[in-house]
Curated annotation (Swiss-Prot):
Protein name as annotated: Shugoshin
The keyword Cell division is annotated on this UniProt entry: yes
Homology family: Belongs to the shugoshin family.
Keywords from the named record: Cell cycle, Cell division, Centromere, Chromosome, Chromosome partition, Coiled coil, Cytoplasm, Cytoskeleton, Kinetochore, Meiosis, Mitosis, Ubl conjugation
Domain of life: Eukaryota
Bias kind Polar residues: ranges: 513-526
Biased segments, Basic and acidic residues type: 11-20, 173-185, 448-459
UniProt biased composition (Basic residues): 328-337
Length: 590
């Protein structure tokens, strides 16, 4: 039974094996197809990416190319503008250069024409044949004149060239006459440079206006610069023939042409120009006095050539001759300064003696001025400390007379009164030797007191005085107001009353010897001092009543002089109060 079962299984297995062999081949083929399709898709995607990238790059490159094209177009435009600018600048430069060259050529032609015109005038004055070279420049002379008159550079250079040609003509004349003499050349050159002559604007050259216009039509010859120079040399060689007066006339005419060519010349100033000629012009007639100049100087030549300037020349030449005749008076520019200095010196000499006298009069018042403002109020004790009270050493330093020899005692007081009465005229010149001085009016006679009245007054005042320090001050005022014939020094220290106080006080000299009778500053002080003493001291009321005769003497123009230090004594009194302590500023005993 088992054999029958195995046989069908083998047939089924064969069938399955044959079916399984076909499926993997199909699968492989299918896989290959899938792979190929994927490869194709990948390749297509890569190409699409590349195309997109290339498109972007192309767009960027196109933008850059457009910008570059714009820049190139701008650069091309700039290049065109620069080329146009350079061409325009070159054209402008060439035009300016041509204009300048034309102006220079016209000016040079005009100058040579005028130089030839001078030579032609010389030839006419000397009756010489005219030169053929002058006709070369006639074509452009009138046109160049119209151009050159308006240019300032032409006027400057023309004056230089005309002066140079004028100097050449003068040198040729001197070489003909003198030979190697050089000093007249320098003088003539100097004078020809400084000589000036005004010509009115109506002046026109006679030859030039008539000859220029027809020669412009006929002559058509171009003259180079070398021909101008050769013509100038030939004309200068031909100019060696004229004489000296002709050269003078030529110089005057060239200067007139110079003045004519300057348009800003004022024709209303002939007097001012003549004054300049009088001062600054050198002696133009020096050549006439040179011994090597035997030729005369006829004047009708220039007057014939210049008929319009005869009046001006007649005004200029006398001024120049007067300037040469009065050469030391007007030649010097600063000749007016020394009179000013002399006038100043004269004023100083007249004024200085007055100032010296005033200074000498002030010398005697120096000490009063120095102590003027100190004694203002005599009642204040603080001012007393400020006042200067020199000691005995300072008195010796300020005086040459011994103070002790000038003291007066009782026994020689009478002789001193007699001596004073005999020598009244000598008192004003003597210096005052003490603080209290009696100044007299010497023009009127005074009533004289006797010596008995003097002693009575002094005795009465001595009895009415107090026993304190006011005794000394009263003695001083009695000596002030006592007789006219009192001595210059009154003895104060050698009194019997003062001997009682010798133990308390050591007295010194009060003040130096100042002030004489001529001092006016101290004459106003006795009134102040008398008022101050009557107000501050009650003990002097009876003194004024008892001395009425002394007041009568005061009314007879007798001025008592007191120093400031005398009035300082009354500061001790105060307002009627007794002073306990006295300052040690008084004289000592002898």
């Amino acid at each position: 039974m088992p054999k029958r079962k195995i046989a069908p299984n083998k047939e089924s297995s064969r069938r399955t094996v044959s079916h399984d062999d076909l499926t993997p081949q199909i699968q492989e083929f299918q896989n290959l197809m899938d792979l190929e399709s994927q490869k194709v898709e990948n390749i297509r995607q890569s190409y699409s990416r590349q195309n997109s990238l290339l498109a972007k790059d192309n767009s960027i490159l196109k933008i850059k190319v457009n910008s570059l094209e714009k820049k190139i177009s701008q650069l091309v435009q700039e290049n065109v503008t620069l080329r146009s600018k350079t061409s325009i600048s070159e054209a402008i430069y060439r035009e300016r250069l041509s204009n300048q060259l034309q102006v220079i050529e016209n000016g040079i032609i005009q100058r040579f024409d005028e130089i030839f015109y001078m030579f032609e005038n010389v030839r006419k004055n000397e009756n010489l044949p005219s030169s053929s070279l002058r006709t070369m420049l006639k074509r452009t002379s009138s046109r160049s004149r119209s151009c050159s008159l308006s240019s300032p550079t032409y006027s400057k250079s023309y004056t230089r060239l005309s002066n140079h040609e004028n100097n050449l003509s003068h040198e040729s004349s001197f070489n003909k006459d003198d030979g190697p003499d050089l000093e007249p050349k320098a003088k003539k050159r100097k004078s020809s440079r400084r000589q000036s002559m005004f010509v009115s604007t109506s002046l026109e050259p006679e030859d030039e206006t008539g000859e220029n216009e027809p020669m412009m039509e006929n002559s058509s010859v171009e003259v180079p610069a070398e021909s101008h120079e050769s013509a100038q040399v030939e004309e200068t060689i031909d100019a060696l023939n004229p004489e000296e007066e002709n050269s003078d006339s030529v110089s005057n005419f060239t200067n007139s042409i110079i003045e004519y060519s300057i348009p800003e010349e004022n024709p209303t100033e002939p007097e001012h120009s003549s004054s300049k000629l009088e001062i600054f012009n050198d002696s133009t007639n020096m050549l006439s006095t040179v011994p090597s100049n035997p030729l005369p100087l006829p004047l009708p030549g220039p007057s014939a050539t210049l008929p319009t300037t005869t009046s001006d020349a007649s005004t200029v030449y006398p001024s120049s001759s007067s300037s040469t005749n009065s050469h030391p008076k007007t030649k010097i520019k600063h000749s007016m300064k020394p009179p000013r200095i002399e006038l100043k010196k004269k004023v100083i000499d007249e004024v200085m003696p007055v100032s010296n006298m005033s200074s000498n009069s002030e010398i005697s018042f120096t000490r009063t001025r120095r102590t003027r403002g100190k004694a203002v109020d005599y009642t204040l004790p603080s001012l007393r400390a400020k006042m200067r009270r020199p000691s005995e050493k300072l008195v010796d330093a300020t005086t040459v007379i011994d103070i002790h020899d000038l003291q007066v005692s009782k026994r020689n007081r009478e002789t001193s009164h007699k001596r004073k009465s005999l020598s009244q005229d000598s008192i004003p010149d003597e210096p005052q030797l003490r603080e209290v001085v009696v100044s007299k009016d010497y023009g009127t006679p005074k009533g004289k007191k006797t010596e008995d009245e003097i002693h009575e007054d002094t005795a009465h005042l001595m009895t009415t005085s107090n026993n304190n320090s006011n005794n000394k001050n009263e003695k001083k005022l009695t000596s002030n107001n006592s007789p006219k014939k009192s001595s210059p020094l009154l003895d104060i220290t050698n009194k019997s009353e003062n001997k009682k106080k010798s133990t308390r006080t050591k007295k010194l000299f009060k003040n130096a010897i100042v002030n004489n009778l001529s001092d006016e500053n101290s004459t106003t002080r006795p009134s102040k001092s008398s008022k101050g003493t009557s107000n501050n001291n009650n003990n002097y009321n009876n003194f004024d009543n008892n001395n009425s005769n002394i007041n009568n003497v005061n009314n007879k123009s007798v001025s008592f002089r007191l120093n400031e230090d005398d009035l300082a004594v009354f500061d001790l009194f105060g307002n009627g109060k007794a002073v306990k302590h006295q300052p040690k500023t008084y004289r000592t005993k002898k």
